């Protein structure tokens, strides 16, 4: 199984980052994608990926929350990172109109610039969208024919948004959000709508610890070693074999990010 979304640069992992990676290996993961969400965190993510060759890779990009910081210098830094062999996607990029930590116009400018960069470098995009589905799709659609692909990371949207993203040829990333009986039931019901070859799985650790997991850690921190629980639950709700789902979602990630086949 492949973890497409781990925020390994988070300070929550400062005391045991190496052990977190080793526990992921022990849990049966074949690889992980470390998320870059700002210029500095993209640098750190790439360095961390370097420490675990053939197991960790990274993205390079600027999250919509950080879009106000996008400028020519940041773009140059992301471009410099993105040509490195273990940086396999542009992002996390997109729109977030839920909190608007950056003004909408700055978010749109940073998103469009990163789509242009992905086209230039022929890299897939690692996408974020919250409460902005229609505008997100409008900005993204003209670029898709010139991109290798993209995944909507940590999808928590509506059925209408899911159908829209699938119609655009995007892959869908599902997290432990779906394990939350308070807010994940609608998403749970939508799981069978996602074609198996478009589904990817992720923890988004250290966030989104699955609520239905037994023996949860006292610190409430999520980590990639808990991905098997998400695989098991998603397989249950889709009516599929967990090992089959683990394998096909692994293959999907490796295909999108142009990685070698799992061993």
Curated annotation (Swiss-Prot):
The keyword Nuclease applies. Its cofactor is Mg(2+). InterPro entries: DNase_TatD-rel_CS, Exonuc_TatD, Metal_Hydrolase, TatD-like, TatD-type_Hydrolase. PROSITE patterns: TATD_2. GO terms for cellular component: cytoplasm. It comes from the Bacteria. Keywords: Cytoplasm, Exonuclease, Hydrolase, Magnesium, Metal-binding, Nuclease. GO terms for molecular function: 3'-5'-RNA exonuclease activity; magnesium ion binding; single-stranded DNA 3'-5' DNA exonuclease activity. Its EC number is 3.1.11.-, 3.1.13.-. A divalent metal cation binds at residues 92, 128, 153. It is found in: Cytoplasm. Transmembrane segments: none annotated. HAMAP family: TatD_exonuclease. Monomer. 3'-5' exonuclease that prefers single-stranded DNA and RNA. May play a role in the H(2)O(2)-induced DNA damage repair. Belongs to the metallo-dependent hydrolases superfamily. TatD-type hydrolase family. TatD subfamily. This is 3'-5' ssDNA/RNA exonuclease TatD. It comes from Rahnella sp. (strain Y9602). The lineage of its organism: Bacteria, Pseudomonadati, Pseudomonadota, Gammaproteobacteria, Enterobacterales. The gene is tatD.
